Amino acid sequence: MYANAQPLSPLRFIERSAEVFPQREAIVYGDQSWTYQAFERDVRRFATALLPHLPPLSVSGDDAAASGDAAGQGYLGAEQLTRSLPTVAVIAPNLPAMLMAHYAVPAAGAVLVPLNPRLSTRELDYILEHSEARVVIADSSVLDSVAAAIEGKDGITLVQLPDEQAGIEPVREHSHGEKIPTFDEFIDVEPREAGRAASSGERGVSYGVTDENSPITLNYTSGTTGRPKGVLYGHRGAYLNSLGEVFHNGFDGATRYLWTLPMFHCNGWCTTWAVTAAGGTHVCLRAVRPDAIWDAFDNQGITHLCGAPAVCSIIVDADEAHALDNPIRITTAGAPPAPSIIERLESAGFGIVHVYGLTEVFGPITICEPQEEWKELSPQDRAQQMSRQGVGMVQAESARIVDTEMNDVPKDGEALGEVVLRGNNVMIGYYKDPEATEQAFFGGWFHTGDLGVMHPNGYIQLRDRAKDIIISGGENISSIEVEQALYSHPDVIDVAVIGVAHEKWGERPVAHVVRSAGSSVTGEELREHVRERLSGFKVPDTVTFSDELPRTATGKVRKNLLRG
């Protein structure tokens, strides 16, 4: 350690907030609450309970030095990708225990694997095998599926997480007749004091690290087109990305953040650590239900939330919806909300910010920074500006749009290229897949596979995923562009456009649409609506209506299912 160089880790945030704001409310879940002092105490109990179930530490100063040697390959931490890591999987919704795991697991010297409780047994089997999880903590509602996934795997400690608030009782025995301890039973230990950093061969509870580029979490991609990839995040990236979230969201001690975004998705965009850094309050929410969201708005003084555009629709379409007494900031990612949704949210008192990112970059890495002059625009024109993915966040480098030779495309809003990214919040790499990592980091930049344009003001705008571009008669059709044209119709609340094989043109666009309640708009009317806005060859050949679109837990449309 040096006086002027301290390894960075977001674990420091809970230590600091517990010291500075011991009696401030840190977590609320139903009728339960934790002060920062109690939050930190339970984190240490959790970490202490994990210690006997983890292997001896293998990280040494030599490993820390080796992570720097990989810089010649265009990225740090190459050696982390192939060695076995001590991992702890937590399969749960947005409960206090999932939040605590973001501190307790790395404080015990392990790597957190946060997982979606809606994953199938087959998916869990693959991820738990790939990650080599030593401890698995699972919501009691999915215990049978989890127990089936770990069957035949040796050396795994299984812990269940009942939820009294939701009426989910503990399962006393699983199918093999074994008693599974509850989370409260598991952490019922005398907490160890937290040291600064454990030395080689010793395992203890520590809020410090010797190597800031060592892994803190292992997040799995949604795997919509194949096996999910394991994305390794480092302590340094998590620390800096968290502070970027604090800055861009304006988090402070008065922040009351509602957990509508899954914590298992990119560690909740690092908000698991960011709100704690600011000394704000985490308001946990088990399920994204309109009544629960509006109850939190009315009774918990919510100031911020994040989520997919689908969450925005849930909020404004709720029976409980009404004008807010105090403004609430919504940060949304993915496809921008429809102009009609933006107008309804703003009129109710919500402020909306659009961000862009991927699992590989800790969640958001660019932000569509609002400009003062946009306030004078019509809702339609303002929505058009807000639909852009914007500029790099403060903790990241500027995003680039490049051609196949890695040259920047013209800033004309027309020239199409790939979005490439660089910065402190880019992953260490894909766990156990150095070849895919090398490909992703070609030329010293992370290649997103997203296609976009660069506007004259430096704001990027996505046109499509490379695999979702529809090539019709040799012309590129952006599915996003067609979706946005359909979204501009007031009766369209959700839409996905895909390419289908065509004997003459190669591919043609087809639209899958969810209409607003009571709407009788026809497919031909929607096709005419698109024709008024886009070139004729971009108009979908057919429009199919359904009650809902298949989505991942993080709100992405599963276009692979629509393609069949």
Locations of regions flagged by a protein language model:
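Conserved AMP-binding/adenylation subdomain of ANL enzymes
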Residues: 239-256, 264-304, 318-319
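AMP-binding/adenylate-forming catalytic core of the ANL superfamily
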Residues: 119, 136-138, 305, 423, ...
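Conserved AMP-binding A3 loop
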Residues: 35-38, 216-240
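Adenylate-forming
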Residues: 93, 138-147, 261, 288-291, ...
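Conserved AMP-binding/adenylate-forming
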Residues: 32, 49-119, 280, 298, 330, 337-353, 476, ...
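Conserved pre-ATP/AMP-binding loop-to-beta segment of ANL
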Residues: 22-23, 160, 179-220, 227, ...
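Structural core segment of the AMP-binding/adenylate-forming
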Residues: 52, 65-73, 107-189, 194-198, ...
